[in-house]
From Swiss-Prot:
Enzyme nomenclature, EC number: 4.3.3.7
Recorded catalytic activity of this chain's protein: L-aspartate 4-semialdehyde + pyruvate = (2S,4S)-4-hydroxy-2,3,4,5-tetrahydrodipicolinate + H2O + H(+)
Protein name: 4-hydroxy-tetrahydrodipicolinate synthase
The keyword rRNA processing belongs to this UniProt entry's keyword annotation: no
Function: Catalyzes the condensation of (S)-aspartate-beta-semialdehyde [(S)-ASA] and pyruvate to 4-hydroxy-tetrahydrodipicolinate (HTPA).
Subunit description: Homodimer.
Gene of this entry: dapA
Family: Belongs to the DapA family.
Amino acid sequence: MIAGSMVALVTPMDAQGGLDWDSLSKLVDFHLQEGTNAIVAVGTTGESATLSVAEHIEVIRRVVDQVNGRIPVIAGTGANSTSEAVELTENAKTAGADACLLVTPYYNKPTQEGLYLHFKHIAEAVAIPQILYNVPGRTVCDMLPDTVERLSKVPNIIGIKEATGDLKRGREVLDRVSTDFLVYSGDDPTAVELMLMGGKGNISVTANVAPRAMSELCAAAMAGDAETARAINERLMPLHRALFLEANPIPVKWALHEMGLMGNGIRLPLTWLSQSYQEPLRQAMRQTGVLA
């Protein structure tokens, strides 16, 4: 079972926007050393929207090769074209990913039936474990619990990243699916509560900069140790919030650069963190102990 703290890994770039393979390797080692339970490559935080197909595949391949089976590697393969999502998922399987994360189609606003048929088609086309990803704040497409329940019965679909941050929604999804269907949080501030309700982990932005703490938080929450999990979460809350001062992954890439783990590259239309937000993020990093 894929569970625990799953980092939504950034894709390091140089100042010209080229992929920085040395920094990618450094980040993977960082997570292996700090107790991260799984790596999610080329998802939202990994800037999948601005990677070419060749770059997308190469990032997955390099992460898989370096991890070498020590922890699971999940590849972001969602698209707003069903055929493109199938192609990306096939490529991820060939590259050696353990599972795929598929965001709901964005911009074209499918119906719930369209969402069901989209994910069902991908699951039937590619034999690899697949995780649904619901993040309506970014996609303007909300996959409702009825649809999640239907899809949970489709072979190869093993779980969902529920990133609404709405704990009532999380509770409803948990109540509707079988216990072997994996419900993950995709919202750092509320992840601890979803796990205490039965969620199996957190696909985390914060884990990029505080992997050990996020791993300990997830372990405590999944063991039912609410006191420990909530205490860690309270300590991390300034960081959870500061990492969304601008659109993800702008702040987290700046934070990793500040920590000396990567360069200062990001691709247009995203831009480097605004000057006015740099000191507030730096202070949050110091407050939570990730920066001296």
